[in-house]
């Protein structure tokens, strides 16, 4: 299991979403919360699965064309308000061709041609990201070159959405398509197309536990270790 950096970890520092209160309730002090805030700055910005799947929280950046450029980003810092680091955390795929200004005020909206070109240049089959609520748990876009995976059912206890887990394992046992075959197909089609072999069968869908079945954990006394 590998945790990746996301943009809302700055909100945790600001004591949003209840993490600070949970630490105070369980451990009796803010020491655990402070330690977690320090750890967040060291989380990886992105991860690559078997050289085929790029995992990132948000999306792409107009300042990044290759995976090597992602590797050069200094990650031990708070997420900046602009630039490639910010874009990787905040950008979203959209039903457009290239780039557009994001209504979020940070990052960009990027289109089908952007995703196809990035995957083609970097030998990727898929970009897996989160960052946007998807009612069905996952959403394939850009000719199946990118997928949004949402793993929080009934988000904020009111959205009524299902969630999903992306299961990659079986496909990693099969060899990737040779680059020559990819280029041959691209030449016949005139532009990069989808090389993804991922589909609905790769996603495990689950729902929130019904309210009547929820079991609250017993409230244990605060551990002396963290006092």
Enumerate the language-model features and the residues they cover.
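Single conserved hydrophobic/aromatic residue that forms the stacking wall/gate
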Residues: 1-8, 12
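Divalent metal-coordination and catalytic microenvironments
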Residues: 7, 40, 57, 131, ...
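Conserved active-site segment immediately N-terminal to the catalytic lysine
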Residues: 40, 146-151
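Active-site-proximal loop/helix segment associated with metal-binding centers of metalloenzymes
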Residues: 13-31, 53-125, 136, 151-157, ...
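Short linear motifs in low-complexity or flexible loops
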Residues: 174-176, 180, 184, 188
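Short, well-ordered beta-strand micro-motif
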Residues: 48, 55, 148, 165-169
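Conserved N-terminal structural segment that caps and organizes enzyme catalytic cores in eukaryotes
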Residues: 33-36, 41-47
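Short amphipathic alpha-helical segments embedded in low-complexity Lys/Glu-rich regions
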Residues: 133-137, 145
């Amino acid at each position: 299991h590998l945790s990746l950096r996301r943009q809302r970890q700055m909100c945790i520092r600001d004591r949003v979403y209840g993490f600070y209160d949970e630490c105070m309730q369980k451990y009796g002090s803010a020491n655990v919360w402070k330690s977690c805030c320090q750890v967040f700055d060291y989380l990886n910005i992105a991860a690559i699965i078997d050289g085929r799947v790029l995992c990132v929280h948000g999306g792409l950046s107009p300042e990044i064309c290759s995976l090597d450029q992602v590797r050069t980003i200094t990650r031990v810092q708070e997420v900046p308000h602009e630039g490639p680091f910010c874009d990787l955390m905040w950008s979203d795929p959209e039903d457009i061709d290239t780039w557009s200004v994001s209504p979020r005020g940070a990052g960009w909206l990027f289109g089908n041609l952007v995703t196809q070109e990035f995957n083609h240049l970097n030998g990727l089959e898929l970009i897996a990201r989160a960052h946007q609520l998807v009612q069905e748990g996952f959403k394939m876009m850009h000719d199946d070159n990118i997928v949004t995976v949402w793993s929080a059912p009934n988000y904020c206890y009111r959205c009524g959405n299902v969630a999903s887990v992306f299961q990659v394992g079986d496909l990693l046992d099969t060899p990737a398509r040779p680059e020559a075959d990819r280029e041959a197909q691209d030449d016949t089609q005139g532009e990069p197309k989808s090389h993804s072999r991922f589909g609905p069968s790769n996603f495990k869908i689950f729902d929130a536990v019904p309210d009547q079945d929820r079991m609250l954990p017993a409230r244990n006394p605060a551990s002396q270790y963290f006092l």
